Amino acid sequence: MQGDSSPSPTTTSSPLIRPINRNVIHRICSGQVILDLSSAVKELVENSLDAGATSIEINLRDYGEDYFQVIDNGCGISPTNFKVLALKHHTSKLEDFTDLLNLTTYGFRGEALSSLCALGNLTVETRTKNEPVATLLTFDHSGLLTAEKKTARQIGTTVTVRKLFSNLPVRSKEFKRNIRKEYGKLVSLLNAYALIAKGVRFVCSNTTGKNPKSVVLNTQGRGSLKDNIITVFGISTFTSLQPVSICVSEDCRVEGFLSKPGQGTGRNLADRQYFFINGRPVDMPKVSKLVNELYKDTSSRKYPVTILDFIVPGGACDLNVTPDKRKVFFSDETSVIGSLREGLNEIYSSSNASYIVNRFEENSEQPDKAGVSSFQKKSNLLSEGIVLDVSSKTRLGEAIEKENPSLREVEIDNSSPMEKFKFEIKACGTKKGEGSLSVHDVTHLDKTPSKGLPQLNVTEKVTDASKDLSSRSSFAQSTLNTFVTMGKRKHENISTILSETPVLRNQTSSYRVEKSKFEVRALASRCLVEGDQLDDMVISKEDMTPSERDSELGNRISPGTQADNVERHEREHEKPIRFEEPTSDNTLTKGDVERVSEDNPRCSQPLRSVATVLDSPAQSTGPKMFSTLEFSFQNLRTRRLERLSRLQSTGYVSKCMNTPQPKKCFAAATLELSQPDDEERKARALAAATSELERLFRKEDFRRMQVLGQFNLGFIIAKLERDLFIVDQHAADEKFNFEHLARSTVLNQQPLLQPLNLELSPEEEVTVLMHMDIIRENGFLLEENPSAPPGKHFRLRAIPYSKNITFGVEDLKDLISTLGDNHGECSVASSYKTSKTDSICPSRVRAMLASRACRSSVMIGDPLRKNEMQKIVEHLADLESPWNCPHGRPTMRHLVDLTTLLTLPDDDNVNDDDDDDATISLA
């Protein structure tokens, strides 16, 4: 053709085949080895691990765009290897191809450093144990050594790469644009090595601009996979995992951790799934798909946390498939996947589910003791005639003599708005045999009135009943401005009696003080006042004039006894209690209690008596106002006996005394190990805590559940032994109807008047030939025409329908795609019909059945009788997978462990024989 300047094939000779320039080869091949930032750092980290390093530090500048370096404490590089260190295909780990069968190192090709030289500026700083100083090596882009320089460094190696991809313009621009994404991939990859490398400490940090170094990964180099998981992901993630050990064959096994079956253990993304072969991180998409689909059968749409290490002999797999060594071939993949599926089925069986135990959320004020037990013990003291001699002189216990001074905070808790107080109590010792005062002794008060404020009166008392001292916290009952009635509770009921005095244990109130104005010297630093001891203490300042108060006080104070005691204690005890004066007239109401935040367990020891003296450095400028204390122990004893009689008449006390009392709840879950380095102890404690904090629920347990009632016209409250569960009535009934429809629904087949020609890809045609029986079971009838052109070998002759819903070509292609994704023998997708066969259905078929089941189920807002609720719960026991409705909603949740509603005091001095004194009724 005229005007065509292109050479004719007949007149032009074929081009000559010439060798490619070495530099061009180097750059082309290097770009295939180092694909991104994560692959570059991966090669350096693997070199450090092969060198036996126990500490690896990765430092990046501007997320690796400027430079990145890997620092280790490995064996270092000997001077004889300096010149060949970065040459292509030079390695010390492989001599013959057969060595691949027994490979124990991460690297074996000798391409990493050579490729990094071609794509960036490489420097290496290294020292062995035989060298006195380190050497800094500089290489050019071809891998040749250009400079050596002596420098100071510990034994090990530091590899620095600057300006990665700088000599590849397109790759460099793409690298800079996605640098944050590349950095995220790198951190995820380092997590994999930090998990599997036992005894190796990893630190990864990044520095941006003039900002300080930011550490994103810091492990401790523990010696077990369990400890590495806790370090990298935290204890909360580890508690949701369970160990896995599956024997695939005689010489192959799988070990690691998987998310526990049940709700609340998975993740919304599959971002924490790590697979290893003999400790090498690899990609295993088929295993990942298998685990995900089995897990979703029990936990809705979540993805499990997966950490699995395949321990196989060297000849059972091929690692030399891709340049990054992430793709692996098994010699017998089918048997490996099949054996793994059988082992995972035992873990993610649809007949079991794990529920996180919900504790009873107590208020910030926790009961000091088990109410029934405390009440019974105090009542027994009174009923048996054990009466304390309140007028006798008693001595302080020896416990005060040995106690070291310590600071304590006494906090006032008031339900009504009032000013804030802060008391600073300093412990003081006393000599044995000194300082005895009667309980009836009235404290001396000398205070200067300010702005018409009433006087501050404090009276502290101690009971000698040793069994009431089981709590580690001390209670102080004090009064401000006036004495408070604690016993005139006209409308008290059983619940009030059983929770006498709440206490904040080991917590600090928000009440704070800046300085103190009054100084109180105390005989002792610890005191205990039970609420019942002040039942009859009723003093009102409106009922007495100041002169009457002075007269009453004068009658009660004997100058020959009380004044001497006061003077002696002022001389001997110099560690004060300071109060801050309120800024307004404040009066404690009924139930106001001082709470002592006490960390010293010795403070739970009983004291004999306490007298408190208040003294003010200021001189009195006005009339003194006092309140006297009227108290009769006989009246208190009578009141307590009457209360006990009322409870006995109702049968409440006898029922509690005849039922064993539960142990302290969640003791193992809150236990602090005294020997954190004891692995066996930690393992036992972790197992005990796990058993307390989760419940393994089996399908058969639905038949044993007792329905208690309906909540909010939408949920069923049921009890199983000591646990309460809440069941979603709509989701539970919907799942029952869904599985019933899946078993009973038959898809009818509608022949087409004119067959439809299908346009399928070659891969789809192969899938159709492999799974023709499953396609036919779903109602599609295909006709094959081998003489047709490629892509048109099949024609559709019939389509399925159900009632008014018809399925067509798009549903057939959806079914073919599902079958292709499951790769035949690896198929684990659940069937909409029954678990006996692995038949798969189009997504629209499942959606149709789910919609019908939803519309025919009990709705939220429907009132149900008890027998109807029991029927819904029992139906769940007959289902294949009763844990989620077809739309993913959980059918049941753990509500509360009933034993947490009543707990024993946290006291080591309580005998086990006392456990039978009280209980809680779970009925």
Curated annotation (Swiss-Prot):
Main localization, broad class: nucleus
Alphabetical UniProt keywords: DNA damage, DNA repair, Nucleus
Disruption phenotype: Reduced fertility. Increased homeologous recombination frequency.
Disulfide bond positions: none
GO-annotated cellular components: mismatch repair complex; nucleus
Residue stretches of biased makeup (Basic and acidic residues): 543-553, 565-581, 591-601
SMART domains from the UniProt entry: DNA_mis_repair, MutL_C
Region (Disordered), start-end ranges: 543-603
Matching Gene3D superfamilies: 3.30.230.10, Histidine kinase-like ATPase, C-terminal domain, MutL, C-terminal domain, dimerisation subdomain, MutL, C-terminal domain, regulatory subdomain
Origin: domain of life: Eukaryota
GO molecular function term, any single one: ATP-dependent DNA damage sensor activity
Keyword rRNA processing included in the entry's annotation: no
Cell compartments where the protein resides: Nucleus
Biological processes per GO annotation: DNA recombination; fruit development; mismatch repair; pollen development; seed development
Expression by tissue: Expressed at very low levels in mature leaves. Detected in rapidly dividing tissues.
CDD domains registered for this protein in UniProt: HATPase_MutL-MLH-PMS-like, MutL_Trans_hPMS_2_like
Role played: Required for DNA mismatch repair (MMR), correcting base-base mismatches and insertion-deletion loops (IDLs) resulting from DNA replication, DNA damage or from recombination events between non-identical sequences during meiosis. Component of the MutLalpha heterodimer that forms a ternary complex with the MutS heterodimers, which initially recognize the DNA mismatches. This complex is thought to be responsible for directing the downstream MMR events, including strand discrimination, excision, and resynthesis.
Family statement drawn from the similarity comment of this UniProt entry: Belongs to the DNA mismatch repair MutL/HexB family.
Assembly with partners or alone: Heterodimer of MLH1 and PMS1, called MutLalpha, which is the major MMR MutL activity correcting base-base mismatches as well as IDLs. The heterodimer binds double strand DNA independently of a mismatch with positive cooperativity and has more than one DNA binding site. Forms a ternary complex with either the MSH2-MSH6 (MutSalpha) or the MSH2-MSH3 heterodimer (MutSbeta), which recognize and bind to mismatch DNA. Ternary complex formation is promoted by ATP binding.
NCBIfam families, A to Z: mutl
Name listed for the protein in its UniProt record: DNA mismatch repair protein PMS1
Species, as recorded: Arabidopsis thaliana (Mouse-ear cress)
Taxonomic placement: Eukaryota, Viridiplantae, Streptophyta, Embryophyta, Tracheophyta
